[in-house]
């Protein structure tokens, strides 16, 4: 519940930090704000944001804490959809084993956006 989420954020000492939440639940974000987590904000999702976020994550070697067992399960089972006629994998992620991965993508979205800005700024032709 949103009440439990708010309490968990508070108990971990993150109530004053920026928290990025799934933007598909604006009412939940509003409720969590009312519960004192004022810096919660919706994730910005654009065209192909899932695919772009996954490709961004794939650039890095991830080190997963042993206690993060569910996240490890998701990473090990994350898969791509198959073309129904050919059976070949297509460049579309399946909508399974992805809740933790989605949260991870949201947490990195600002870093990814800032990196793109730096690349655009330094790649101008003068």
Language model segments and positions:
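Mg2+-dependent endonuclease catalytic cores in nucleic-acid-processing enzymes, primarily RNase H-like
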Residues: 1-92, 114, 124
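Charge-patterned, long linear interaction tracts outside catalytic cores
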Residues: 94-126
